[in-house]
Amino acid sequence: MTLVPAIGRELSNPPSDGISNLRFSNNSDHLLVSSWDKSVRLYDANGDLMRGEFKHGGAVLDCCFHDDSSGFSVCADTKVRRIDFNAGKEDVLGTHEKPVRCVEYSYAAGQVITGSWDKTIKCWDPRGASGTERTQIGTYMQPERVNSLSLVGNRLVVATAGRHVNIYDLRNMSQPEQRRESSLKYQTRCVRCYPNGTGYALSSVEGRVSMEFFDLSEAAQAKKYAFKCHRKSEDGRDIVYPVNAIAFHPIYGTFASGGCDGFVNIWDGNNKKRLYQYSKYPTSIAALSFSRDGGLLAVASSYTFEEGDKPHEPDAIFVRSVNEIEVKPKPKVYPNPPV
């Protein structure tokens, strides 16, 4: 019997440069991975098998699935691509004016949504033929460069540089439903919507995560809070690490955070508790994704150049089996009432 290390099984054939994102399919244990080595790769995470690879004209900054064997990728070469691993075929949906940082596919709207450093969000209809004039639905100006996107149902959350957060309804993109400022004082690294659709978690470069709610009523806003994480004390000094990644568990609504300290923590946001911390990974955590049933967690251990160019551990993808005890909220224990 092969003993699986505590940090999970390492996949063979990893990218040769920084990993920008990884995502599990909604239908299987297929894993889509984008990288600065200009590649998008499709793995079978269970069988440790690379099923296919596309090479693009620049660093690939994000990717997402459409169905089990096709998806979308966005690139520093400004292009938005549709990629089909079964057919071995790619085509360009369109372009931005600057590198494209993030991509999401909305199953609710049947649209691809991209965010770029050109300070725009664009929506595309992937069913159209190739060519911008046939596939582009709309362009929406943002206050700053787009750093992170997240979708839940018809809601789109856009986090930009300058700590801006815009919240849209995909059915009416003419203007944001809400314009907000991040509750955190420093640059946003990642935004992810709660699976139940009530709000979003947002992480910053300064070792913090904030828990936010869409409902603007006083009662709902009273529930929002922020907490410190991915820090350590050394010689009386607090060393603070960027929190690069957030991933919600699809069943329990708890979430994982990954930081430049090489740690992955599991949190129960409702009860404001850390449930688990995994053993340290070789380098920074660049991205995280739970499988569709929450039974696997994919971890990109990949230096994110937060300390500039320096020797670092090789970029690697680990797939870890998730034990229910690590992710299931613990029931609140109430003291027995006096007799």
UniProtKB/Swiss-Prot annotation:
Gene3D superfamilies for this protein: YVTN repeat-like/Quinoprotein amine dehydrogenase
Domain of life: Eukaryota
Gene encoding the protein: BUB3.2
Family label: Belongs to the WD repeat BUB3 family.
Phenotype when the gene is knocked out: No visible phenotype.
Subcellular location: Nucleus; Chromosome, Centromere, Kinetochore; Cytoplasm, Cytoskeleton, Phragmoplast; Cytoplasm, Cytoskeleton, Spindle
PANTHER family hit by this protein: MRNA EXPORT FACTOR AND BUB3 (PTHR10971)
Single GO BP term: chromosome segregation
WD repeats: 14-53, 95-134, 141-178, 238-277, 280-323
Subunit details: Part of the mitotic checkpoint complex (MCC).
Protein name (database record): Mitotic checkpoint protein BUB3.2
Expressed in which tissues: Expressed in actively dividing tissues such as roots, flower buds, flowers and siliques.
Annotated GO CC locations: kinetochore; nucleus; phragmoplast; spindle
Pfam families: WD40 (PF00400)
Primary site of residence: nucleus
Keywords: Cell cycle, Cell division, Centromere, Chromosome, Chromosome partition, Cytoplasm, Cytoskeleton, Kinetochore, Meiosis, Mitosis, Nucleus, Repeat, WD repeat
Function, in words: Has a dual function in spindle-assembly checkpoint signaling and in promoting the establishment of correct kinetochore-microtubule (K-MT) attachments. Promotes the formation of stable end-on bipolar attachments. Necessary for kinetochore localization of BUB1. The BUB1/BUB3 complex plays a role in the inhibition of anaphase-promoting complex or cyclosome (APC/C) when spindle-assembly checkpoint is activated and inhibits the ubiquitin ligase activity of APC/C by phosphorylating its activator CDC20.
